[in-house]
Amino acid sequence: LEKEQLDIFAKAVEERFGNINALINNAGGGRVSTFSNTTDEAWVAELNLKFFGVIYPTQAFLPLLEVSDNPSIVCVNSLLALQPEPHMVATSAARAGLLNLVYSMAKEFARKGIRVNSILLGTIESGQWQKRYDKAKSSNEPHTESYEAWLNQLAKQKNIPLARFGHPEEPAKALLYLASPASSYTTGSTIDVSGGMAKHI
């Protein structure tokens, strides 16, 4: 993520539209590693993506949000922020830091009328799962399940209470709510979109 490119993009948006009402920060990906086998380079890459994937866009578009009638920033985060997994230690740590950053920005930007919230994703159906299915299907192991049946089996293995993966439009609806005037009195909050996987109170 290049800061200069974001600054250029923000300038182009300002010239065309004048301001923006909402900024959605969605830089993600999961790194499978334990503490012991996470390299220094992997730590830096993970923290850079999760932190500066929010910091740089927010810095670039903050002036445009400050002149909006209903400014909102929404960050896409993960349930790992509150429920770390030992096989995803770097990602879990970075996600927890991002959650704290959201709270901090919400407090600081409140006086400007800019709301800052986030959503915490559970397991959402996406292209990465299709790739994993295709890889399993092309392996030497017997594999006759359909993609849908394979996803359902994974949902059972993961003990997702709603017994299925989330659909992309479901977190999108949560993002729309937090970005819109419908949530005009909400800041520093998170919406859990995990199918009931959350164990926190």
Q: Each PLM stretch: what is its role?
A:
Residues T34-F35, A42-L47, K156:
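Substrate-binding pocket helix/loop in short-chain dehydrogenase/reductase
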Residues T58, A94, V102:
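Active-site helix of classical SDR
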Residues Q83, A174-L176, T187-I201:
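Short C-terminal tail/terminal secondary-structure segment
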Residues E145, N159-P171:
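A conserved structural motif in NAD(P)-dependent oxidoreductases
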